[in-house]
Amino acid sequence: MEAEKTLTNEEIIRELLDLLKKNTMKEQANDVFEICTYVDGLEKKIVSMTEELTSMQDQIKKMQEDTLINNAKKALTEAQERLNARCEQIKSQVFEIKVQVKSTAKNIVDETKAKGGATLCRVTEFVGIKKRLLNVRTEVFRLYENYCKKMMQHDIIGLTKAA
């Protein structure tokens, strides 16, 4: 997945934003920038959650071997695996949206160069992308809440073990 370059720094996005601003479509430029910022933020959040899930997995492996801990360890491992799978699923959705945003921007820019500024009205295609993105964003927040609950359980087990 192409996580090294943020969508807001993509050349084609910058070009589309410039075209929109030059054609007095500042509101549409702001909408496109907002969508790109959402995608960038979601990518960062998913990377952070993936790192934390990996850390959680490492901590689970280090837990002592006794029955109570083993039961908790098994439950936490299963929860961590479910969260990790869901995180990967959402990461894939965000990547698809990112590709769609770049493709739509490229099509609009290319068409504008070929046919003129009137084709910038196609920027309304980003509205559909925004709706999809907001749905993914909601999923990320649900996943993060679930992750936080599991981490609290993990911390409680750690305190019990220490006592």
Positions of predicted regions on the chain:
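Generic detector of well-ordered alpha-helical segments enriched in charged/polar residues
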Residues: 14-17, 84, 91, 121, ...
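Extended amphipathic alpha-helical heptad-repeat regions
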Residues: 64-82, 89, 93-96, 100, ...
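Extended, low-complexity amphipathic alpha-helical repeat segments
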Residues: 97-163
